[in-house]
């Protein structure tokens, strides 16, 4: 699989996860605007550093792949909010 196909696969997984979480939480991510999303990104970065450094998942069933996919989605959410301005 080439890099473009890999990116399509990741984006497809991200969209599926976003769709599921958006059904559960709605647009809660927009409540505090871009700053709020950036704070969530910081949380995810700290989680990924902890997983990478210690090999320990602080959240049950959430490994590095899940955390990186969340980061992908949070970046997209921040872009959505920026486009609304």
Model-derived features with residue positions:
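Intrinsically disordered, low-complexity regulatory regions
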Residues: 1-85
């Amino acid at each position: 699989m080439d890099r473009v196909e890999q990116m399509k696969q990741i984006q497809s997984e991200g969209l599926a996860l976003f769709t599921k979480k958006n059904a559960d939480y709605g647009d809660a991510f927009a409540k505090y605007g871009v700053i709020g999303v950036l704070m969530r990104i910081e949380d995810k970065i700290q989680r990924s550093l902890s997983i990478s450094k210690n090999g320990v998942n602080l959240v049950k069933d959430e490994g590095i792949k899940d955390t990186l996919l969340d980061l992908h989605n949070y970046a997209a959410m921040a872009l959505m909010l920026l486009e609304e301005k």
